[in-house]
Every structure is written in structure tokens, then in C-alpha cells.
Swiss-Prot record:
One of its GO terms (biological process) is phospholipid biosynthetic process. Its main location: membrane. Belongs to the PlsY family. This is Glycerol-3-phosphate acyltransferase. GO terms for cellular component: plasma membrane. The chain crosses the membrane at residues 10-30, 60-80, 86-106, 116-136, 166-186. Pathway: Lipid metabolism; phospholipid metabolism. Keywords: Cell inner membrane, Cell membrane, Lipid biosynthesis, Lipid metabolism, Membrane, Phospholipid biosynthesis, Phospholipid metabolism, Transferase, Transmembrane, Transmembrane helix. It comes from Brucella abortus (strain 2308). SMART domains: G3P_acyltransf.
């Protein structure tokens, strides 16, 4: 049986590993490499896929979405070799790293793609629930933010109903953070000024 000190050090290491991986700002890197400048200067000022889509480059937005998700998936799967607790710590670290990346002044994305990536790494069936909820809401509303909020709200409920209380607790915490990061979007939705999916600028 592992000593408590070693176990705690392993969890801290997994958390730091996840954070470093999650803090890579792919949206910013890709838009600069494509000659589109600083994505933080347009739309919501966010570095995530939805804002990259506002540049009009759908392929770049898709690449950002995939890479931001893979950060979470990779962190969870690699750390899973040291047990589920390490995987949970690394996944949460990746999520926090995306939100608050050290490289760009701790001003990152809103975490939705990385949330999904962590979910794929820890409970792939939950990712299917997330995707279905997101797609249905997006088709009904044509807005990205409520789609993300509805999907992230359903996930911990689905996990809890399946008896996975540890993951349900993790994603409940992450869902609260996602809602906090979407405060401005919620305000714009209420005011009728939120941009629809694919809108430029």
C-alpha cells in the first residue's frame, strides 16, 4: 500500500502535469500561425474554438476545438496509469490550465472543449451525453453558450445516475466553473445581444 505522502505527491504531480498541458493556448497559437493575428482582439476576446470561428476560418476553429479537447483527454489518460484519482487530478488540472494559462497572463478560454476532453478520458459514455445535449440545444437555439451550459449541466446528473459519485462530483464542480466563466454570455443572452454560432467579428 502506498504511503500517504507518496500518494499526495502523486496527486499534486498529476494536477501540475494536467495544468501545464491544459495551459497550451492552441486557439491563439493557431490563429497567429495562420496570419489572423490575435484572436483575443475579436468577438468575445476568448481563445476558444467558438471565437476562432468568428475569424471565418472553420477549419481553424475545428482544429482548435479538437486540440483543446485533446489536452484534457491526454492528461486524464496518461495519468490514469497511476490510478483513477491521478486521472481525476490531471483532468481537473488540464481544465484549470485552459481557463488560467500561465503563459498569457492567466486569461484563457471558458473550458468547454477541455471539459469535453476530460470527460472523454474519464467517462466516454458521458461525452456522448454531452455531445447529444450540445447538438440538440445548438440546433434549437443557434447559440453556442446555452448549448455548452445545458450540456455541462446534464453531465454530472447523468454520471450520478450511473452511480459514479466521484466523477459526478468532479464534473459538478467543473460545471459550476463553466457557468461562472459564461457570466457575460448569460448577460448577453438575456439582453438579446449574444452572437449566434458562426457570426463573424
Amino acid at each position: 500500500m502506498a504511503e500517504p505522502g507518496f500518494f499526495n505527491a502523486m496527486l499534486i504531480g498529476a494536477l501540475i502535469f494536467g495544468y501545464v498541458l491544459g495551459s497550451i493556448p492552441f486557439g491563439l497559437i493557431l490563429t497567429r500561425l495562420a496570419g489572423l493575428g490575435d484572436v483575443r482582439a475579436i468577438g468575445s476576446g476568448n481563445i476558444g474554438a467558438t471565437n476562432v470561428l468568428r475569424t471565418g476560418n472553420k477549419k481553424l476553429a475545428a482544429a482548435t476545438l479538437i486540440l483543446d479537447a485533446l489536452k484534457g483527454t491526454a492528461a486524464a489518460l496518461i495519468a490514469a496509469h497511476f490510478g483513477q484519482n491521478a486521472a481525476i487530478a490531471a483532468g481537473f488540472g488540464a481544465f484549470i490550465g485552459h481557463l488560467f494559462p500561465v503563459w498569457i497572463g492567466f486569461k484563457g478560454g471558458k473550458g468547454v472543449a477541455t471539459y469535453l476532453g476530460v470527460l472523454i478520458g474519464l467517462a466516454w459514455a458521458g461525452a456522448l451525453v454531452f455531445a447529444a445535449a450540445w447538438i440538440v440545444t445548438a440546433l434549437l437555439t443557434r447559440y453556442s453558450s446555452p448549448s455548452a451550459l445545458v450540456a455541462s449541466l446534464i453531465v454530472p446528473i447523468a454520471l450520478y445516475s450511473r452511480g459514479n459519485q466521484a466523477l459526478a462530483a468532479l464534473f459538478a464542480i467543473m460545471t459550476v466553473i463553466v457557468f461562472i466563466k459564461h457570466r457575460a454570455n448569460i448577460s448577453r443572452l438575456l439582453n438579446g445581444t449574444e452572437s449566434k454560432i458562426g457570426a463573424k467579428g
